Amino acid sequence: MHARKILQSAAVLALSAALTLPAGPAQAAAGPNTDFNGDGYNDLAVGSPSYPGYPGTKNSGLVAVLFGGPDGLTYNRHIIRPAPGCTAGGLPCEAWGVNLSAADVDADGRTDLISRGHYDLQVDSWTSQGTATIERRVYGHRTAPWRLMSGQFDDQPGTDIVGPTRGGYWFSVGGWYNRSANLLFTDFADDSYLTKETSAASGDLDGDGKLEIAVVAGRHSGAGELGPHLWLIDDPHRPQVQLTTLGSPSTCTSPPSYGQGCPKADSEVAMGNVNGDGHDDLVMLTPSTASLQVWYGRATGPSSAPGYTVDLSSLATSAELGPGLAVGDVNGDGWAEIVIGASKATVSGHSEAGAVMVIPGSATGPVIKRAQLVTQDGIGPVGGTALADPIAEQSKPGDRFGQAITITDLTGDGKGEVIVGAPAKNGGSGMLAVLFGSATGVLTSTAQAIHPSRYGLNSTQAYFGGVLLK
């Protein structure tokens, strides 16, 4: 390890709208329950859709379930991988682990893992007797939900599995509601069709106990192709769904209007309780405009305009930002942090080595002036000198540290760990960094560097850390 100055092109902290940090208690938001084996510690699922299949098969991909404990990720793991002979409607079981979700599907009080490949998905459940696949859905084509989300989306009992659905050029929202075997597609109340969906997230923005879906997608109507929009969808199980527009080309100017929220094809969305008021908030990162917006949740739903916006161009260039984005409480104060990936950032002279930025939350929103920059070479204030070097690795060209990010409380202390994927490290084998949460933010004294070989995964096509359960 080398504690050195974090050299990131354009990494200078001179952002406007820096906020002060008010005192006061808030509702915790350390992340979802992902305790699969019921031992009291959250676990992590890592997808490796490019992992080679068994010799002689056309199958590919796997999911590694890594179990948490008081010291972080343990050596225990469970591998889900298409078996020889596995087919999905006559097609190979390929790209397993391309998407992951978690919920208590069978209502037994334990969280189940939902994973999918290109043509099928399955639900795996842990019991005292072991692990079993309790559901499998074979759709044989790519029109099923391809960005899985799970939980309570409608007002009927039972877990729903939903997501944006590709059907040729068009997108809709489809899903299996309340453990139904039938895949139901959503019709929209107007003449809109979604096109080119690029990002989606779910959360409870209005506090009614049901999840809403935010999606970045193009729109096509009688007027033709209308460009990227940020939509909010409430209860996709209804016969006709009304789309609420939070951002569209009409909110964009040249240069972009950061105050209004300008969705682009590369925009990423996530949800979490940034201001600690008990409602999830919607966060959008747009690398091409180097901007970040937050729509605050409230009982009547979010405002049509973002309540917080900032220009990130003095922090990192648009070419460096994204696609990693996660929201969760890292320091246990009840205000969720926003963690942004800059996977193509130049670090210590190494191009596309990657970095992540941890922005604290507060009762009034993100506190940019207290942001931390984390690379494999050190951690410190953005644009400053590394104060410590907890990761037992060094930045290398093309590592893509920050390509994927999730926040999960692995240790059970009420503070979320920031888990960062570097899928291109070591020639494509990949790596995870577990940055422990603490009362002062990301812990600077120690971290975990997790290589796939630790779990018997030894392919340079693993790209381990490219897909993480959120």
Give short role names for the model-derived ranges.
Residues 57-62, 120, 225-229, 289-291, ...:
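A detector of repeated loop/turn-to-beta-strand junctions in beta-rich toroidal repeat architectures
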Residues 50-55, 120-121, 167-169, 219-224, ...:
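Short glycine/acidic-enriched loop and turn motifs that connect beta-strands
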Residues 44-46, 63-66, 96, 113, ...:
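Hydrophobic strand positions within the blades of repeat-based beta-sheet folds
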Residues 38-47, 107-116, 155-164, 207-216, ...:
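Acidic/hydrophobic-patterned starts of short beta strands in beta-sheet-rich repeat architectures
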Residues 29-41, 97-105, 146-154, 159, ...:
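Beta-propeller blade termini
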Residues 27-79, 86, 100, 162, ...:
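An edge-strand/N-cap motif at the start of beta-rich repeat modules
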Residues 13, 17-30, 67-95, 123-147, ...:
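Blade-edge motifs of beta-propeller repeat domains
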Residues 1-11:
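Bacterial N-terminal signal peptides that target proteins for export
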